[in-house]
């Protein structure tokens, strides 16, 4: 089940509440490829499931609240679990490995790029100094193939202070807006 507004709950004995959609998963009976089995050797043996959808659909789903739910014949929850998606994100956004991240300053422009594949929205906050409020807010656009959010400002912003606002689903809290520093920064205030 998935929820685009992060308000889904799954309690045993009743149907899932607040889902905006569901996806039937397929049992994957084949052995995992050796490279994947080695990478996740710390995960105990269990059922392997497959989502029979295109990569673009999976990318969009990972930006939402996701629950793996086992239901009875009447649609009542038997068991539910949150998904652990780091391995899936690495596979879905492998192209990001070749993308420049952080800030790149040139005489006539400054590019900002942040890898945040599960974010629902990202904005750049430009600050006058390291402690004051944002003076301007610039929306970033996501490249759905890489999960990188970016924008270009048509001027040299050398020495400018900035942070990001990142809207993301957080298990147990819903949709949360975080003000974060640039993880690729070479200096922080």
What are these model-predicted stretches?
Residues 115-122, 157:
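Short proline/glycine-enriched turn/loop motifs at strand-loop junctions of beta-rich domains
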Residues 1-3, 125-129, 167:
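Predominantly extracellular/luminal cell-surface or secreted proteins
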Residues 122-124, 162:
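Short beta-strand elements bearing conserved aromatic residues within extracellular beta-rich modules
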Residues 5-111, 132-135, 143-189:
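The feature marks proteins involved in alpha-glucan
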Residues 139:
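N-terminal cofactor/phosphate-binding cores enriched in small/glycine residues
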Residues 1, 110-117:
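Short edge beta-strand/loop segments characteristic of extracellular beta-sandwich folds
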């Amino acid at each position: 089940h998935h929820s685009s507004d992060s308000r889904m709950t799954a309690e045993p004995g009743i149907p899932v509440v607040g889902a905006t959609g569901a996806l039937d998963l397929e049992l994957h009976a084949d052995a995992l490829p050796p490279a994947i089995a080695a990478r996740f050797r710390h995960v105990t043996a269990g059922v392997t499931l497959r989502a029979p959808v295109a990569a673009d659909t999976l990318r969009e789903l990972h930006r939402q609240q996701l629950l793996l739910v086992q239901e009875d014949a009447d649609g009542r929850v038997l068991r539910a679990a949150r998904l652990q998606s780091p391995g899936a994100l690495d596979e879905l956004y492998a192209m990001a490995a070749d993308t420049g991240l952080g800030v790149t300053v040139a005489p006539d422009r400054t590019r900002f790029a942040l890898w945040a594949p599960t974010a629902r929205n990202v904005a750049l906050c430009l600050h006058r100094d390291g402690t004051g409020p944002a003076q301007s807010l610039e929306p970033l656009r996501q490249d759905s193939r890489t999960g990188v959010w970016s924008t270009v400002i048509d001027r040299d912003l050398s020495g400018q202070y900035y942070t990001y606002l990142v809207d993301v689903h957080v298990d147990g809290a819903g949709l949360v807006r975080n003000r974060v520093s640039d993880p690729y920064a070479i200096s922080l205030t």
